[in-house]
Swiss-Prot record:
Disruption phenotype: When both FocA and FocB are missing, an unidentified system can transport formate. The gene is focB. The keyword Transmembrane helix applies. The lineage of its organism: Bacteria, Pseudomonadati, Pseudomonadota, Gammaproteobacteria, Enterobacterales. Residues 57-68, 134-163, 212-248 are periplasmic. This is Formate channel FocB. Keywords: Cell inner membrane, Cell membrane, Membrane, Transmembrane, Transmembrane helix, Transport. It is found in: Cell inner membrane.
Amino acid sequence: MRNKLSFDLQLSARKAAIAERIAAHKIARSKVSVFLMAMSAGVFMAIGFTFYLSVIADAPSSQALTHLVGGLCFTLGFILLAVCGTSLFTSSVMTVMAKSRGVISWRTWLINALLVACGNLAGIACFSLLIWFSGLVMSENAMWGVAVLHCAEGKMHHTFTESVSLGIMCNLMVCLALWMSYCGRSLCDKIVAMILPITLFVASGFEHCIANLFVIPFAIAIRHFAPPPFWQLAHSSADNFPALTVSHFITANLLPVMLGNIIGGAVLVSMCYRAIYLRQEP
């Protein structure tokens, strides 16, 4: 009974120590292992976003319930990440804890982060090809493809400051969800701990750079390569989505959101909690 109570009431310092050990373990993996795990994470993130798009495809975007249900569905991607132990860029920035401990150099940390990001992109690209050739874009009278276009278009009109801020808040929620999952004794505990923070960031429209690497390039592909029957079913045209270009995506969304994600995860969660709970440790 005492051991059980001790576990339930263990100090946040222990969670910080667990997070730091996990960070060091991730960095210690081989480059091939890191890349393959990151590819899996990219696939899982795309799966979660596909579930989200399938739910909102034929629903009014103004309905709060739609955002809530869509957010809950999106958590599938993060549940798969937690269960399978893969590496997502936005959570891997927490490995900065290992740098502050002196376990690794900045060069090692940067190489690991870039490798994870490239692996995430490769996984997303593979799953995107499957989605494209599956014909899902044309399903429900092209409503699925239209949902992709509108979702991506809405992400392209934020200012730089807005994108950074939305990125900070997003990865704050993602990394806090991961931090909370360290408290769980069972798989169910970990999943339940993650649901609300992830649902919050999705329902609130916060920006996640890896999720955006799926939906925005996919929308750009639809804009340029969708066949005429798609636009007929959609009662629209490619000219209605002028913001969906590669250059605009990189400058207006990807880079500022990635910067915000790094700040939210590496600074506001990892470094902050390490300074609070582990600063006095040797």
